[in-house]
């Protein structure tokens, strides 16, 4: 009987279940979208029970469509949208409020107060993160402050908090396991990434009872088994968990210090493995835990770019310049340059290394001769410039010069963008055969825990290159183009 690993990839807009075989190949995928809630401008919420329902649906679909029996699943790995926050009643199992999504800005006031009280440096030193509505800590505080009776219940020990991985493990195990892994814990703003413990001082500042928090475990370990009535009468080990970006780093087999990957999704997330040392950034990067495995914790530097693939959606839906995303490549290839045009896609501010939430999008260098092709090309180039900004910060912080960049995500299908990215960075860009690196990373973590794969060496040997893009641009031209980008960003930031 052939065995498989089931990876549950719980994302921001949809849930997916992917079956992988021994060679790390995709056997089948099932996907289901779920509803987004926007109660007020800047707020984004999900219904945690709807997420759970979507997970049950994709599990059933993937097994039946692939004709795989539940007994053939050797283990389950979970990867998830990070930071999104669920608080539920441990007796009824019901959430007391919607899940507050990572993108939601509803805790901006709480963050502002904390900054004014001078806590910035304390939080950064302990957690590796910035005080920002993005992370879970202030979201938990908001729920306790704004849901009637929540604080009393929390003090009595009746409420549980979890990121999405924790919620799904709790549900799948029938409430037997309240756990998270090191990578997800490191995104909460509550976890000390040096002592590897929940931080009492921060919990006190935010007024969050410790009894709400899950146990923090390695990213590759059997946390619990599924209860039979949630998995067709079978008990399957839930054996791996990691936040989506860390899972992608693992799926890309970036196991050596200095290896990095960039995921081009709605935004871009670039992570560099820094080994067993937590490198504190001086250039606006986040210090995060990559994973805990084999009795060790390894760290990463992370850069976040808020707008990447969504800039191409904007060309399609907002400006109606293209009919489908892939047209952007065709148009960009029709011209030799942008003819001096720069697009700064700061629709929701700028992330690493600028961290300016007030700056807005801008276009520079337009002339009467500017065409649609120039504009589309400039929009694609902005993704590569932003990635270069992040890499420059990483190299400065880590002292490691990048040798190659591994890439994944929707936009990596765009050959023009990948070539321009390689030209801008001056290093080869490697696109793998399997683009589902996030789900693959979670599968690998689970498979290692149950002996389905032997070790990381075996996994690294499965990584396959689909295409390598080599830098072809003269250094002088590259520097000139990048200087223009820096000038454009500076001008955009001055216009407020």
Curated annotation (Swiss-Prot):
EC number(s) from the headed UniProt entry: 2.7.1.30
Class in the EC hierarchy, top level: transferase
Regulation: Activated by phosphorylation and inhibited by fructose 1,6-bisphosphate (FBP).
Modified residues annotated as Phosphohistidine in this record: 230
Key words, A-Z: ATP-binding, Glycerol metabolism, Kinase, Nucleotide-binding, Phosphoprotein, Transferase
Catalytic activities: glycerol + ATP = sn-glycerol 3-phosphate + ADP + H(+)
NCBIfam families: glycerol_kin, PRK00047.1
Entry-linked HAMAP family: Glycerol_kin (MF_00186)
Protein name, UniProt field: Glycerol kinase
